[in-house]
Amino acid sequence: MPNLVADFFRVHRDADVFVDFNDESDRELFVRICDFRDGLLPQVGDVVVAGCWGATPAKAHVIEVSDAWVRLRLLD
């Protein structure tokens, strides 16, 4: 089974996190730690580049980090 997140990062070298913009609610997204580029550990206050297949990447502010997920607020 192909690893879609790894494939995404091979193609989109500027993105920090793989998101589904269709899940956006009030300019916020919830993602899992494993959806971030390998080696990137998000911290509250970070600004990251969020990307999705077929969509323009967007800057996002990390506003909450838990053991299970990271909450992002889109800036663009």
Could you tell me what each predicted segment is?
Residues 40-43:
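Short, well-ordered loop/turn sites that connect or cap secondary structure elements
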